[in-house]
Amino acid sequence: MSQCPYQASQVDLSDEGVHWDQDISYGQYLDLDAVLKCQNPRSDKHDEMLFIVIHQVSELWMKLCLHEAHGAANSLMAGNLSTAFKMLTRVARIQEQLIKAWEVLVTMTPADYAIFRDDLGQSSGS
């Protein structure tokens, strides 16, 4: 049986530690109260929550994609190619996540969507 490949690490972590800010929790840092209140279905149909969450998550991924693309452009202009490459690699991974998100959405059939589509008004593309 082989040993864990990380067991004999050459990295000295003796001066590393977990840095805790006692004044802020994980939920506070991420502003989870606000984020989790942003899903407001217009109907009582079960699948509308899926529709909302998938689209909100996609918007957040796209926001991060733009943030990384701008950072990469700034790094390129500064001649920092390795940082730009890292950021562009991150953009590619974000795009992979966006594509994978559709695998969840396709579990909702067109008939499922049609049940609450009228409740979305003009936001539904109608």
Predicted regions and their residues:
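Surface-exposed peri-terminal alpha-helical interaction modules
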Residues: 1-126
